[in-house]
Amino acid sequence: PIAGSMVLAAILLKLGGYGIIRMVQILPTTKTDLFIPFIVLALWGATLANLTCLQQTDLKSLIAYSSISHMGLVVAAVIIQSPWGLSGAMALMIAHGFTSSALFCLANTTYERTHTRILILTRGFHNILPMATTWWLLTNLMNIATPPTMNFTSELLIVSTLFNWCPTTIIMLGLSMLITTTYSLHMFLSTQMGSPMLNYQTEPSHSREHLLMILHIIPLLMISMKPELVI
């Protein structure tokens, strides 16, 4: 069910991040060198989750692994225990909560019309539902953290934190962000471009679907314009 996926990605996964933030506060702040293995594992896990996204043929699986990769960055930033790291982690959890929920919503919009989640079978939607293509583009741009969105602000804070802590981490961070951009564009092009593979009668997009997307994107853009509300 799509509602379960949206709640899981937007709220429950972030509750785990909140739990990590509360737990880290009781750890010694001066001994961050002890946490090197955990930070390396978090960054490596984010990179592996991104690589797994590139291999997915199922749309919902791709979005789910995308959420996991972003949580790897959150964990790495939280463990360092700097003010910028905590602010970036909080901002990324909020921003990605909106983004991943919107992506699941769009995936369901596609599934209701094609009755399949296989990427190659859902192509050609820019000719059929041009407004939905606009939502896909906006949401994917947010997913790859383009400015001036909240995703960009949060990832910039996390990158600054990790680079100040250890400049070598920029290698894994850069690789992770490059792969994120690759699979996001792959997802957009696979679902929207080309000619439709299946011969089916497609009903037009409904007002409720546009309203759902507006309720995801407008709050995120408003928070992006005034990030001090959450940072």
UniProtKB/Swiss-Prot annotation:
Source species, domain of life: Eukaryota
Keywords: Electron transport, Membrane, Mitochondrion, NAD, Respiratory chain, Translocase, Transmembrane, Transmembrane helix, Transport, Ubiquinone
GO terms under cellular component: mitochondrial membrane
Record membrane topology: Multi-pass membrane protein
Enzyme Commission (EC) number: 7.1.1.2
A GO molecular function held by the record: ubiquinone binding
Transmembrane parts of this sequence: 1-21, 34-54, 61-80, 84-106, 118-138, 156-176, 211-231
GO biological process: ATP synthesis coupled electron transport; electron transport coupled proton transport
Catalytic activity: a ubiquinone + NADH + 5 H(+)(in) = a ubiquinol + NAD(+) + 4 H(+)(out)
Family, similarity comment: Belongs to the complex I subunit 4 family.
Function in brief: Core subunit of the mitochondrial membrane respiratory chain NADH dehydrogenase (Complex I) that is believed to belong to the minimal assembly required for catalysis. Complex I functions in the transfer of electrons from NADH to the respiratory chain. The immediate electron acceptor for the enzyme is believed to be ubiquinone.
Name recorded for this polypeptide: NADH-ubiquinone oxidoreductase chain 4
Organism field: Hypnale hypnale (Merrem's hump-nosed viper)
